[in-house]
């Protein structure tokens, strides 16, 4: 038996990059995979096909992870489609690098909203489900810059430090 056989994983921001790699690895271990991305595009459709080719159920959901109501609706739909959520991987993230003195409020807000607020949104939506199931795992993707900081990435560093604090507090 594979490590995650019979489990359902929800991976945010998994249309490409690290999120896609996580989704593919979970599928290799037998998990059915629900995943989100900002829009359903060619890359997302290709990821879905790759997951299904591994013999698991897979479905992509368009979601603005920074929107509280949208994330709750996506989680509701995942439960309707898959029956449960055993693993949440908060991976959705962006960068908008720049020195603090040149950074706009919009750049700050965009990174905090996608990288940190989205994790709160999805955790808020899945914890009642996991509590009812009497189990589940939540993985928050952070970065070394959440601990050390990084010049030119104060928004990104703050968002990743927030992810660490969030993980320690739930």
Residue map of PLM features:
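Conserved glycine-rich cofactor-binding loop
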Residues: 8, 15-17
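Conserved glycine-rich Rossmann-like NAD(P)H-binding loop of the short-chain dehydrogenase/reductase
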Residues: 29-46
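The beta1-alpha1 cofactor-binding region of Rossmann-like NAD(H)/NADP(H)-dependent oxidoreductases
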Residues: 41, 62-74, 105
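Substrate-binding pocket helix/loop in short-chain dehydrogenase/reductase
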Residues: 99-100, 107-112
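Active-site loop immediately N-terminal to the catalytic Tyr-X3-Lys motif
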Residues: 101, 148-154
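Active-site helix of classical SDR
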Residues: 123, 159, 167
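Residue(s) in the substrate-gating loop at a strand-loop-helix junction
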Residues: 143
């Amino acid at each position: 038996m594979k490590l995650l056989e019979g489990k359902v994983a929800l991976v945010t921001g998994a249309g490409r990059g690290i999120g896609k790699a996580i989704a593919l690895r979970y599928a290799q271990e037998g998990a059915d995979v629900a995943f989100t991305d900002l829009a359903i595009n060619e890359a997302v459709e290709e990821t879905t096909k790759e997951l299904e080719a591994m013999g698991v159920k897979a479905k992509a959901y368009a979601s603005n992870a920074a929107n509280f109501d949208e994330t709750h609706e996506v989680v509701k739909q995942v439960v309707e489609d898959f029956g449960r959520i055993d693993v949440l991987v908060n991976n959705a993230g962006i960068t908008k690098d720049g020195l603090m003195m040149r950074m706009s409020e919009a750049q700050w807000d965009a990174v905090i909203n996608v990288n940190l607020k989205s994790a709160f949104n999805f955790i808020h939506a899945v914890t009642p489900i996991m509590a009812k199931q009497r189990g589940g795992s939540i993985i928050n993707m952070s970065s070394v810059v959440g601990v050390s900081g990084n010049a030119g990435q104060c928004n990104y560093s703050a968002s990743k430090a927030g992810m660490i604090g969030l993980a320690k507090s739930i």
